[in-house]
Amino acid sequence: MSDIQSLTTQALADVAAAQSPDVLEQLRVALLGKSGSITSQLKQLGALPADERKAAGEAINQARDALSHALGERKAVLEDAALDARLAAESIDITLPGRSAERAGLHPITRTLERITGIFGRLGYELSEGPEIEDDWHNFEALNFPPHHPARAMHDTFYFGDGRLLRTHTSGVQVRYMGDHAPPLRMIAAGKVYRSDSDQTHSPMFHQVEGLLVDEHSTFADLKGTLAEFVRAFFERDFEMRFRPSYFPFVEPGAEVDIAWQQPDGSTRWLEVLGCGMVHPNVLRNVGIDPERYTGFAFGMGVERFAMLRYGVNDLRAFFENDVRFLKQFA
């Protein structure tokens, strides 16, 4: 019993004299560690006579508790002292200018999307949104896609097990809009779309803006004038444009729009930027609009495509790699 008392007295004195956290940790290990003095005393209880074990066990436990408490208190004192010393050593020059707050910036795709929708908003088009998970009717069938069309294939479209799919274009929003609004109407649909494709100029997820106008006297000339005005407003300069005949199931006739794009070396080449056409009569019938009375035109564009042209980006994937160094250029 006297051994544990003398051990405790000396240990408490050593703890009180410790001048650093490292020394304190060494004492903790030497006293309360697996091979520590107090731990060894506990292990030796079994060798004592039965009538002495209880008193000895209580004394050892009391010593262990006292040492644990002393170690904790001394640690707190040393940590406070270290903090005070560090604060005393640090000085603040109150004449230095304050740090400016970090300012965030819009992602270049968001900037481009807002620019596109803003231009069409000024032309009287209403922005509409729809679900990214679509059914076959809104994504394909209502838009005059035949059952054998390649776009319905698994390698082009992301399907769910129940037959639903990730929309491959925002045209489904147009179908919903025409079902809820009577002509005359003009609207644009903007948002994410998904296709099974990934390379330097394609991404499995990208952003699209599609526009629609339905009226009694809309013509291809109206479509051409609308797109010419948009291209001029977006790039803030005039371009020579050409409309090439092309096939899209939901328009007839259909066309792809090219602009005469000037290369860094001064040469010019035709660059495809849009798809468009007059709304197919079957699409109008599918949403309850009389194609004998109404005609319409539609157009669509990839937002990333326009962002790449506006900001001079060569690789589409750079927009989605979250490299802050790249994104800060556009903030």
From Swiss-Prot:
Top enzyme class: ligase
Where do the annotations place Mg(2+) binding? E252
Q: Is Lipoprotein set as a keyword in this record?
A: no
Subcellular location(s) of the protein: Cytoplasm
Instruction: Report which reactions are catalysed by this protein.
Output: tRNA(Phe) + L-phenylalanine + ATP = L-phenylalanyl-tRNA(Phe) + AMP + diphosphate + H(+)
Q: What is one term from the GO cellular component aspect held by the record? A: cytoplasm
Record's keyword terms, sorted: Aminoacyl-tRNA synthetase, ATP-binding, Cytoplasm, Ligase, Magnesium, Metal-binding, Nucleotide-binding, Protein biosynthesis
Query: EC?
Result: 6.1.1.20
In terms of one coarse class, where is the protein primarily found?
A: cytoplasm
Subunit record text: Tetramer of two alpha and two beta subunits.
The protein depicted here goes by the name Phenylalanine--tRNA ligase alpha subunit
Species name: Stenotrophomonas maltophilia (strain R551-3)
Higher taxonomy: Bacteria, Pseudomonadati, Pseudomonadota, Gammaproteobacteria, Lysobacterales
